């Protein structure tokens, strides 16, 4: 399964140190994090809050361990701030990733987002964009796509819990109204299943737009509890709603089969934020690596 060297396996540092809740994994160093990634058998990663931003220092640390940068998250505010503000921050982010050799830029709209709010009920208070906000988002993403293309890069949109692009309908509209040459999709199994979507339907419908994949599993009993007890996104993460592939409810075999059949090329990034004091990140990275090897041969 998968053409040789066409798909690379990475892992996100958020399992070691959490960007939204820095107290989770606060004691874990950057060096420990990337050393354990490499030791677990991964060849790449995304960027966390403890990573040095000096590209020479970062390149050396990663190359010693055989790692490279797959991408990094960018928070857009296209619906809530002037475009120029997002564009300036985006260009700096783009240039950093370009220097690190990445080909795609993860973008998520954070206007009205509740994902970083500790007390806001995730499902009851989910933001919904107005028509005016949709127009700003679509136009802004197309323009960010143009800025990415200046460096031969692509933006991949990250649908995410607690944001205006979370559900199947919202993803469908985003894909329908953005320019396919300028805006691609980041496919995240965990966010779809947690939201209550049919992740295979979304995969098959938009498979030709997918340029980046996050492999994330869901503990369904925790997901149900989040709905019932009106928990926030951050409370859900602390409660363990997400875990690594093979440790939750999702069967990844049909996901891999569909992406293989479509000739997917790019990164698979294991991204499973949970409390490292409860779920040892190295142990869970090893679990994920073994499951992926057994399930699709990578």
Swiss-Prot record:
Enzyme class name: lyase
Single GO BP term: inositol catabolic process
Enzyme Commission number, as recorded: 4.2.1.44
Source domain of life: Bacteria
Catalytic activity of the protein: scyllo-inosose = 3D-3,5/4-trihydroxycyclohexane-1,2-dione + H2O
Protein's UniProt name: Inosose dehydratase
Cofactor requirement: glutathione; Co(2+); Mn(2+)
Keywords on record: Cobalt, Lyase, Manganese
Disulfides per UniProt: none
InterPro entries in the cross-refs: IolE (IPR023952), IolE/MocC (IPR030823), IolE/XylAMocC-like (IPR050312), Xyl_isomerase-like_sf (IPR036237), Xyl_isomerase-like_TIM-brl (IPR013022)
């Amino acid at each position: 399964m998968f053409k040789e060297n066409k798909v690379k396996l990475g892992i996100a540092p958020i399992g070691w140190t959490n960007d939204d809740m820095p107290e989770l994994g606060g004691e874990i160093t950057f060096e420990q994090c990337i050393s354990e990634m490499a030791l677990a058998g991964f060849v790449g990663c995304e960027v966390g809050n403890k990573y040095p931003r000096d590209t020479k220092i970062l390149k050396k640390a990663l190359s010693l361990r055989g790692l490279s940068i797959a991408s990094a998250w960018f928070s857009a505010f296209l619906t809530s701030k002037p475009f120029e503000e997002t564009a300036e921050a985006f260009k700096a982010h783009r240039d950093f990733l370009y220097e690190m050799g990445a080909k795609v830029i993860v973008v998520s709209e954070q206007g009205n987002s509740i994902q970083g709010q500790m007390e806001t009920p995730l499902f009851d208070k989910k933001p919904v964009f107005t028509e005016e906000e949709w127009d700003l988002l679509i136009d802004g993403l197309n323009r960010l796509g143009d800025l990415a293309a200046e460096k031969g890069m692509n933006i991949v949109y990250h649908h995410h819990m607690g944001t205006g692009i979370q559900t199947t309908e919202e993803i469908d509209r985003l894909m329908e109204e953005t320019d396919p040459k300028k805006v691609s999709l980041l496919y995240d199994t965990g966010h779809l299943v947690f939201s209550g979507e049919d992740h295979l339907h979304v995969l098959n419908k938009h498979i030709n737009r997918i340029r980046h994949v996050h492999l994330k599993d869901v503990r369904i009993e925790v997901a149900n509890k989040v709905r019932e007890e009106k928990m926030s996104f951050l409370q859900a993460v602390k409660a363990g709603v997400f875990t690594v592939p093979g440790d939750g409810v999702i069967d990844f075999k049909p996901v891999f089969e569909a992406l293989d059949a479509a000739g997917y090329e790019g990164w698979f990034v294991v991204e499973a934020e949970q409390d490292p004091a409860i779920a040892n990140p190295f142990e869970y990275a090893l679990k994920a690596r073994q499951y992926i090897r057994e399930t699709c041969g990578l």
